[in-house]
């Protein structure tokens, strides 16, 4: 019977080649040390980055189309709004006149918030999940500030006894 190869190296391919069917490298050990929430957090981060790479490619492919439509909109000089113009057409015309950097900022803030939330799910301490979301972060900071003010007021009320 052939002896299985020594899998003490850092390679996971060695364990697959040995026929054991299980990973035994440091990645597998780190994965087994995580709880379910952390594993799902890392899977979510990976899928989110993959989807954002696809969206990033798509956005920069349509950036040229957006610029062309915006230029066409600026070059047209309608004297007065037409009677048959719907509110959706009017809204589309106004939104196309916004610069691309503004659209980038509008979409970047929720994107970063979602990424930071998924990344916070990978933390070992479940109490730290969600601290990076702006409303929660502001609430925590305000709560800490109020606790500090309350503590400093209590200290100032203490009377010093001269001996």
Curated annotation (Swiss-Prot):
Keywords: Golgi apparatus, Membrane, Transmembrane, Transmembrane helix
Function of the protein: Required for mannose-6-phosphate-dependent trafficking of lysosomal enzymes. LYSET bridges GlcNAc-1-phosphate transferase (GNPTAB), to the membrane-bound transcription factor site-1 protease (MBTPS1), thus allowing proteolytic activation of the GNPTAB. GNPTAB is involved in the regulation of M6P-dependent Golgi-to-lysosome trafficking of lysosomal enzymes. LYSET is thus an essential factor for maturation and delivery of lysosomal hydrolases. Plays an essential function for cells that depend on lysosomal catabolism to generate nutrients.
Location of the protein in the cell: Golgi apparatus membrane
Disruption phenotype: LYSET knockout mice display increased lysosomal enzyme serum levels and storage materials in lysosomes. In addition, LYSET KO embryonic fibroblasts are resistant to infection by EBOV glycoprotein (VSV-EBOV).
InterPro entries with a match to the protein in the record: LYSET
GO cellular-component term (any): Golgi apparatus
Protein name, per record: Lysosomal enzyme trafficking factor
Subunit comment: Interacts with GNPTAB; this interaction is important for proper localization of GNPTAB in Golgi stacks. Interacts with MBTPS1.
Organism superkingdom: Eukaryota
């Amino acid at each position: 019977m052939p002896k299985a190869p020594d899998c003490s190296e850092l390679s996971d391919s060695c364990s697959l080649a040995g026929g054991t069917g299980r990973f035994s490298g440091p990645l597998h050990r780190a994965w087994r040390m995580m709880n379910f929430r952390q594993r799902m957090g890392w899977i979510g981060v990976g899928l989110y980055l993959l989807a954002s790479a696809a969206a990033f490619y798509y956005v920069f492919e349509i950036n040229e189309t957006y610029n062309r439509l915006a230029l066409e909109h600026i070059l047209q000089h309608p004297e007065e709004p037409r009677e048959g113009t719907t509110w959706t057409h009017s809204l589309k015309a106004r939104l196309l006149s916004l610069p691309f950097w503004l659209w980038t900022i509008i979409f970047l803030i929720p994107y970063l918030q979602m990424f930071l939330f998924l990344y916070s799910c990978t933390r070992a301490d479940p109490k730290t999940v969600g601290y990076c979301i702006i409303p929660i972060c502001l609430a925590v900071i305000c709560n800490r500030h109020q606790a500090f003010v309350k503590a400093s007021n209590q200290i100032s009320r203490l009377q010093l006894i001269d001996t």
